[in-house]
Amino acid sequence: MSAAVLLSVLFALACGQAASFCIPTEYTMYVDRRECAYCLTINTTICAGYCMTRDINGKLFLPKYALSQDVCTYRDFIYRTVEIPGCPHHVTPYFSFPVAVSCKCGKCNTDNSDCIHEAVRTNYCTKPQSFYLGGFSV
């Protein structure tokens, strides 16, 4: 293998490791309220991807804030509100959710993100579905 090819491969690997791939990603979620007749399928965007992290040796000697890792999180987002069809009059039929506009690698903000790794939850409807298409329910 020539030196130029070897150098270009090493350069590509180094750039791939240093770059963060944290971008808005399409995501489908299902809103299922017990009291309402329908489940609402919502297409939105969330922040997902890879952020560069390091595991520090000598963790015993560092303060806790120095041990936190960067995560892929919201830089800018907006909230959208939809109406879940088939809800009785005594139930509030509105559901608000964040839509990622741009993302960044940074500390997790508990004001707008779930920062705890949970077990995988089922993400499906248990009732007939109604779809939300960006401005109105169908």
Curated annotation (Swiss-Prot):
It holds the Pfam family Cys_knot. Heterodimer of a common alpha chain and a unique beta chain which confers biological specificity to thyrotropin, lutropin, follitropin and gonadotropin. It is found in: Secreted. It comes from Mus musculus. One of its GO terms (molecular function) is hormone activity. The keyword Transcription regulation does not apply. Coiled coil: none annotated. GO terms for cellular component: cytoplasm; extracellular region. Residues 133-138 form a propeptide. This is Thyrotropin subunit beta. The keyword Electron transport does not apply. CDD domains: GHB_like (cd00069).
